[in-house]
């Protein structure tokens, strides 16, 4: 795998032939594309692609998941309004009413759909093959 330390800003892209861990944020307009998994230890607001070579078993995980788009293998999910700055989450879910940060989440493919759920040991045991 590969580690990238720093914030990816709009217009910047990071590509990896393996999995990638971003220690920082992926801002709106920035993109990460990995043949393996994508893990963002920060806020994910850009375009995140895992399994870029068609691997539907890859996943995307982030401490704060607010992406404009997630692609896993051949599957794509987009933000409900394309404006993650308004604290919208994928499919229109928003932060808690008291504006507390959301818990770390993971996006994965199941039954030909991309699902985003809070990371738990049980879930990791299910999706990591």
PLM segments and residue spans:
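Short, surface-exposed beta-edge/turn micro-motifs
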Residues: 17, 29, 35, 56-57, ...
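Intrinsically disordered, low-complexity terminal regions
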Residues: 1-10, 51-129
């Amino acid at each position: 795998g590969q580690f990238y330390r720093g914030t990816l800003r709009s217009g910047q892209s990071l590509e990896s032939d393996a999995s990638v861990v971003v220690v920082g944020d992926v801002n709106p307009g920035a993109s990460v594309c990995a043949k393996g998994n994508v893990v963002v230890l920060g806020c994910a607001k850009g375009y995140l692609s895992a399994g870029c070579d068609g691997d539907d078993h890859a996943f995307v995980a982030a401490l704060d998941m607010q992406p404009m788009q997630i692609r896993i293998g051949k599957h794509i999910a987009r933000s409900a309004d394309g404006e993650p700055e308004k604290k919208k989450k994928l499919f229109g879910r928003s932060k808690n009413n008291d504006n507390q940060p959301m818990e770390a989440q993971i996006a994965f493919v199941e039954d030909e759909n991309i699902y985003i759920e809070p990371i738990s040991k049980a879930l990791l045991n299910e999706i990591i093959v």
